[in-house]
Curated annotation (Swiss-Prot):
Superkingdom of the organism of origin: Bacteria
Signal peptide span: none
GO terms classed as biological process: protein complex oligomerization; protein folding
Key word Cytoplasm present: yes
Name of this protein: Chaperone protein TorD
Family note: Belongs to the TorD/DmsD family. TorD subfamily.
Subcellular location field: Cytoplasm
Length: 209
């Protein structure tokens, strides 16, 4: 594969992970995620040993969503984990993990920083996604953009400062809170995201050095 092909594949993974943290899975999205093309994508991603377990869990849950009730239960899991904002949830905002304040404000420093990154790239958070710019979905989507539009050093700098600096804490919180739910979809998604970011970071470091 050429560097262009590799970066395109990396962008696809970041965009996929971003989309799954951005909103609940509805019937239309489920069809996309379980299509023949998507199944091939999941299988290829799962070939890597560090991704195989979470990918298998994700595929198992997606292929088992065969009723409206099951979809609603997964949507409730998403809401309980990411939208409620209690001690039993895992808020997906960087500021809550990076701010030294005991009760950091949304739309704070990390939001402003990400907004500036987006502005510099002539991008913005879409109007139908009314969340602070330091939401994990926005950050992962921006990293996907960088893979095809920035040098390796700039990608690594952003990854270290804006993702790797807090992702492990967030993932640990997701796993802790999601353990109450039977299918563990979001635990698997979070675990996959961390493994992917760690591998991508390692490959960027090797490419630079």
């Amino acid at each position: 594969m050429s560097n262009v092909d590799i970066n395109h594949a990396r962008a696809l993974v970041y965009q996929l992970l971003s989309s799954l943290f951005a909103r609940e899975i509805d019937e239309q999205r489920l069809k996309q995620l379980t299509s023949e093309q998507a199944q091939l994508f999941w299988t290829q991603l799962g070939y890597a040993s560090e991704f195989s377990a979470p990918v298998a869990n994700i595929q198992k849950v997606l292929n088992g969503l065969t009723s409206d009730e099951a979809l609603l239960e997964l949507a409730a899991d998403y809401c309980g984990l990411f939208l409620v904002g209690t001690k039993h949830s895992a808020s997906p905002y960087a500021s809550l993990y990076l701010s030294p304040e005991e009760e950091p404000l949304l739309f704070g420093q990390q939001h402003q920083q990400m907004s500036e990154f987006l502005h510099q790239s002539q991008l913005q958070v879409q109007s139908h996604f009314p969340e602070p710019a330091d939401h994990l979905a926005v950050i992962l989507a921006y990293m996907g953009h960088l893979t095809c539009h920035s040098e390796d050093a700039a990608q690594l700098s952003f990854l270290n400062a804006c993702i790797d600096s807090w992702l492990a804490k967030f993932v640990a919180k997701v796993v802790e809170c999601d353990s109450k739910h039977s299918n563990g979809f979001y635990s698997a998604l979070a675990t996959l995201t961390l493994a992917w970011v760690q591998q991508d970071k390692q490959q960027l470091e090797q490419a630079i050095n």
